[in-house]
């Protein structure tokens, strides 16, 4: 959150920095992480300019025209809470009949693990099958253009030519990264099998690399189809969308690792954690998007398939990511101090939920322990405090209304209600009374507004909450419900 009027010197730079992980994987043409950026950014930008300046007869990918990012306020989601609940209940009641899995050919890829080789084979089988929906014929990436970082040597034998620029593939660029490049030698895919693959396998076994590989192949398809006129952030979220479509396809066929509800949970959380650093501008070179938008794109693909993802070219998705507008926000990453979060945000949450009830919710609410709140604030950010209270007051509201609070349906409604609070804050701001800067004994009104990172803080709080400990396997649906409330407000939350 941020003040629109007053400066509070006691606000400390706590929050999202503690969990903004360095998994900013991928990019068409080559996108580097912070650690590799100093090595490669200038060279990669030169390569971009080379590609954009004139046609490439060896690999005609077209020109990268302006495709402005749509930073307008999202005009609403496409489903209501009751639709999400119906889908969950139907999946619990109806036995799933799997579709036949395709026969795959496991190609020898120098240095690649058997798991990654299988991921690549499955993703290529997916594109071979669904390409007809997009009216093109998928062409497999040449096995000699698939490079784990561990195989990139110092001898310069493995090159990527951008017409006048001939460069050896650089292991430093691949560090904790993955990328796709339109080299004259052929579309080239590089991934870090030393650090990144190990990290993903430890935290999201199987699923992390499957999502990474399927995302990169989204870029492969963009190049094969010459979809190179989008802004970077739209290209990246289209690749996220294609990745989500692959997850659904694999799940329908019982293809590992998408054979359990937990796999889909891991897919969403790993996507959330590969977001851009908080406060990044959406129009920046190599921008991927905040977690809120990247998860939305992944869920678009899972729910709607590759044809919908393809439409990103014509109608870019709504972008909620914003950059910092003041040096103060940048310094504290848009976060209030814990004391300000507790004293300003919590009463706002309480007032919002009380306005939804005909009786006081005080006797129904299970107040969180301060230690829990301080830990959330320190590891996630200021809005985690407000989100935790929103989830608890959602349960209090349900109980006061005589509704059930146990089970997946009520949990999804609480997530939607928490999102509706964010919707209200996004549209109207939060008016609070704070001590005047000129005279601390006097109070004056100021307005809190959502800052960059707040929506991601809400999702992260949700994915680590008791709601999911009590309802394992529904991260996908919980995040979707939160988004419905955030974009459509209270009317979408099926509140009696």
Residue locations for each model-derived region?
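A metal-dependent hydrolase signature that marks the N-terminal structural subdomain at the beginning
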Residues: 32-165, 307-365
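Long, well-structured alpha-helical subdomains associated
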Residues: 250-312, 425-496
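An active-site-proximal "capping" alpha-helix that borders the catalytic cofactor pocket
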Residues: 233-249, 409-424
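Catalytic zinc-binding patch centered on the HExxH motif and its immediate surroundings
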Residues: 150-190, 358-379, 383
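Short pre-active-site segment immediately N-terminal to the catalytic Zn-binding motif
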Residues: 194-211, 227-233, 375-387, 404-408
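Catalytic Zn2+-binding segment of zinc metalloproteases
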Residues: 217-231, 250-251, 393-408, 421-427
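C-terminal motif of bacterial Sec signal peptides marking the signal peptidase cleavage site
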Residues: 22-25
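Bacterial signal peptide processing site
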Residues: 27-30
């Amino acid at each position: 959150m941020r003040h629109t009027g007053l400066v509070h010197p006691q606000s400390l730079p706590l929050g999202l920095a503690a969990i903004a992980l360095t998994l900013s994987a991928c990019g068409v043409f080559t996108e580097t992480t912070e650690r590799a950026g100093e090595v490669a950014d200038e060279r990669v930008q030169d390569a971009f300019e080379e590609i954009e300046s004139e046609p490439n007869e060896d690999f005609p990918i077209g020109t990268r025209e302006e495709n402005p990012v749509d930073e307008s306020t999202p005009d609403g989601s496409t489903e209501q809470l009751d639709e999400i609940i119906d889908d969950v209940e139907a999946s619990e009641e109806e036995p799933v009949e799997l579709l036949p899995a395709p026969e795959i050919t496991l190609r020898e890829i120098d240095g690649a693990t058997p798991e990654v080789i299988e991921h690549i084979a499955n993703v290529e089988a997916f594109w071979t099958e669904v390409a007809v929906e997009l009216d093109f014929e998928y062409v497999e990436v040449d096995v000699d253009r698939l490079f784990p970082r561990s195989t990139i040597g110092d001898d310069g034998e493995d090159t990527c030519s951008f017409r006048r620029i001939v460069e050896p593939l650089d292991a430093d660029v691949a560090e904790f990264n993955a990328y796709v490049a339109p080299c004259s030698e052929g579309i080239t895919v590089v991934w870090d099998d030393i650090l990144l693959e190990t990290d993903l396998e430890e935290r999201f076994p199987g699923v992390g690399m499957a999502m990474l590989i399927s995302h990169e192949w989204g870029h492969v398809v963009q190049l094969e189809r010459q979809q190179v006129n989008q802004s970077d952030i739209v290209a990246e979220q289209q690749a996220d969308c294609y990745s989500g479509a692959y997850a659904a396809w694999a799940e329908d066929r019982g293809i590992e690792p998408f054979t359990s509800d937990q796999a889909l949970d891991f897919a969403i959380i790993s996507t959330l954690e590969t977001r851009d650093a908080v406060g990044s501008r959406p129009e920046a070179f190599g921008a991927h998007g905040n977690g809120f938008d990247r998860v939305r794109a992944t869920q678009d693909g899972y729910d709607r398939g590759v044809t919908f993802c393809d439409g990103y070219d014509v109608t870019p998705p709504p972008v909620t990511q914003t950059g910092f507008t003041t040096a103060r926000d940048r310094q504290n990453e848009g976060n209030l101090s814990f004391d300000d979060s507790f004293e300003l945000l919590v009463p706002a949450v309480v007032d919002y939920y009380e306005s939804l009830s005909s009786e006081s919710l005080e006797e129904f609410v299970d107040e969180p322990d301060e230690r829990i709140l301080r830990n959330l604030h320190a590891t996630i950010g200021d809005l985690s405090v407000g989100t935790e209270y929103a989830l608890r007051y959602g349960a209090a509201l349900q109980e006061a209304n005589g509704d059930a609070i146990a089970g997946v349906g009520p949990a999804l409604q609480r997530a939607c209600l928490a999102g509706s609070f964010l919707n209200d804050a996004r549209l109207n701001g939060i008016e609070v009374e704070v001590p005047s800067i000129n005279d601390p004994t006097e109070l004056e009104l100021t307005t809190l507004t959502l800052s960059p990172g707040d929506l991601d803080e809400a999702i992260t709080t949700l994915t680590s909450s008791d709601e999911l400990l009590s309802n394992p396997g529904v991260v996908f649906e919980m995040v979707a419900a939160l988004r419905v409330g955030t974009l459509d407000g209270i009317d979408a939350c099926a509140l009696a």
